[in-house]
Amino acid sequence: MEMNVGKIVNTHGVKGEVKILTASDFAAERFKPGKVLMIPFKNERVTLTIKSYRTHKNFHMLAFEGLNNINDVEKYKGLDVYQEIENEDIILDENEYFYSDIIGCTVFDGEREIGIVNDIFETGANDVWVVQGDKEYLIPYIEDVVKSIDIDNKKIIIEAIEGLL
């Protein structure tokens, strides 16, 4: 399955490194050197192999094999990057889920439908789900709030703490 794993938001330095704003979970695993990314560019699909990966100020910094200066990567700025995903290669602990499993789930506060998870971002302490309903809600993925997750039926039950909704 091919999945959008981020966007090249800028170049970094003059040696061909790019800043990626991730749209995926497990970035350190997804962006390991040797992994392959695809970029739709001018009606083609460019395939790039990751040469190096590091984090810097909440961004993921990548360099690609064969692209050794800023001129080689400048043209990809602003483009989404995709990867062939094999989620089954990553073993999850209990109460851990892939972003792709959570995004698209309908969230309920008891019986009341709140909305659909359309994005997830990391805060350091816990993930926060962006839920779009009659307005946008930010739901922390913490035990006190999230009571059950049913991936098969794309249904999440929360117990909203005061001020959350």
Swiss-Prot record:
Keywords: Chaperone, Cytoplasm, Ribosome biogenesis, rRNA processing
GO biological process: ribosomal small subunit biogenesis; rRNA processing
MF GO annotations: ribosome binding
Ranges for domain PRC barrel: 93-164
Keyword Chaperone included in the entry's annotation: yes
Compartments (UniProt record): Cytoplasm
GO cellular component terms given for this protein: cytoplasm; ribosome
Pfam families referenced in this protein's UniProt entry, alphabetically: PRC_RimM (PF24986), RimM (PF01782)
Record Gene3D superfamilies: PRC-barrel domain, RimM
Described purpose of this protein according to its UniProt entry: An accessory protein needed during the final step in the assembly of 30S ribosomal subunit, possibly for assembly of the head region. Essential for efficient processing of 16S rRNA. May be needed both before and after RbfA during the maturation of 16S rRNA. It has affinity for free ribosomal 30S subunits but not for 70S ribosomes.
Oligomer status and interactors: Binds ribosomal protein uS19.
Family the entry assigns: Belongs to the RimM family.
Record comment regarding domains: The PRC barrel domain binds ribosomal protein uS19.
Protein name as it appears in the record: Ribosome maturation factor RimM
Organism of derivation: Macrococcus caseolyticus (strain JCSC5402)
Lineage start: Bacteria, Bacillati, Bacillota, Bacilli, Bacillales
